[in-house]
UniProtKB/Swiss-Prot annotation:
Keywords from the named record: Actin capping, Actin-binding, Cytoplasm, Cytoskeleton
Name of the molecule in the record: F-actin-capping protein subunit alpha
Keyword Cytoplasm: yes
Gene Ontology molecular-function annotations: actin filament binding
Tree of life domain: Eukaryota
Subunit field text: Heterodimer of an alpha and a beta subunit.
SS bond list: none
Organism the protein comes from: Yarrowia lipolytica (strain CLIB 122 / E 150)
UniProt family annotation: Belongs to the F-actin-capping protein alpha subunit family.
Gene Ontology biological-process annotations: actin cytoskeleton organization; barbed-end actin filament capping
Subcellular localization, as worded in the UniProt entry: Cytoplasm, Cytoskeleton
Known function: F-actin-capping proteins bind in a Ca(2+)-independent manner to the fast growing ends of actin filaments (barbed end) thereby blocking the exchange of subunits at these ends. Unlike other capping proteins (such as gelsolin and severin), these proteins do not sever actin filaments.
Length: 262
């Protein structure tokens, strides 16, 4: 396969909708007729996709994240909430506890409280100190309902460095029943100078503003753009006699086909 074709397949993986990575890889496998050489080259792209999207995994009775921010080695990660270290299988998408890892950030408790108050229970949030002295705060949650043809995900990542806080908020929603509609929204936020004790409050305000802006844009889209796509009924300015003359209209003829009322 040419380099351009391989890059195109990599783009498909990178743009896989939330909760649908396995289906995308299976579809590619079908298209290339199970070519092991092509599929092996995609492994790196799949791994990068998982790390970039900060995949949520089950770790015992709790949830944790698989991301570059809490990666200790190729397949080893840690959970900042429980202080556990775990191995992650990129093929089966399963996490297995493998020991303890010191994690005692005072920010974690405040972040957990905020996360549990504003997000459903299918996600996870973590505080991960980085080698360069910065701190990464990652919040990920999603709702997946393939039985009703829709999936959605929220991912926000913030970096606290030298007293300043900045980050990116991403929302990705896919609806695919009798069609294919996808909402993707991403916004970079610069929250400026923030004390460590005020980090979570700053995040809360930024995400509230983002959600309000997103709701406003969506309502405008529904009222204006989508409304313009609808077929408008013609204005005839003629009156309809809903009494004796109803049978003269096509609707009346259709109603009277059965010859009576049940």
């Amino acid at each position: 396969m040419s380099r351009s074709n391989q890059e195109a397949l990599a783009d498909f993986v990178a743009d896989a909708p939330p909760g649908e990575l396995n289906q995308v890889v299976e579809a590619i496998s079908t298209v290339v007729d199970g070519n092991s050489s092509i599929l092996s080259k995609l492994e790196t792209d799949v791994h990068n996709k998982i790390l970039d999207q900060c995949m949520v995994v089950s770790l015992g009775k709790s949830k944790s994240l698989v991301s570059k921010y809490n990666q200790l080695s190729k397949d080893t990660f840690y959970d900042s909430q429980s202080g556990q270290k775990f191995e992650f299988d990129f093929d089966t998408k399963k996490a297995t506890p493998s020991g303890s890892h010191g994690s005692d950030s005072p920010i974690q408790g405040a972040l957990d409280k905020y996360f549990s108050a504003h997000f459903p229970s299918e996600g996870a949030a973590g505080v991960f100190p980085q080698d360069d002295g910065s701190i990464a705060l990652v919040l990920v949650d999603g709702k997946y309902n393939p039985a009703n043809y829709w999936n959605g995900k929220w991912r926000s990542v913030y970096i606290f460095e030298s007293g300043s806080l900045s980050g990116t908020i991403d929302v990705d929603v896919h609806y695919y029943e009798d069609g294919n509609v996808r909402l993707k929204s991403s916004e970079k936020v610069d929250l400026g100078s923030v004390s460590e004790s005020d980090i979570v409050d700053a995040i809360s305000k930024a995400e509230q503003q983002f959600q309000e802006k997103l709701n406003k844009s969506f309502n405008g889209l529904n009222e204006d753009s989508f409304k313009a796509l609808r077929r408008q009924l013609p204005v005839t300015r003629s009156k309809i006699n809903w009494g004796k003359s109803i049978s003269n209209y096509r609707l009346g003829k259709d109603i009277n086909v059965g010859g009576g009322r049940e």
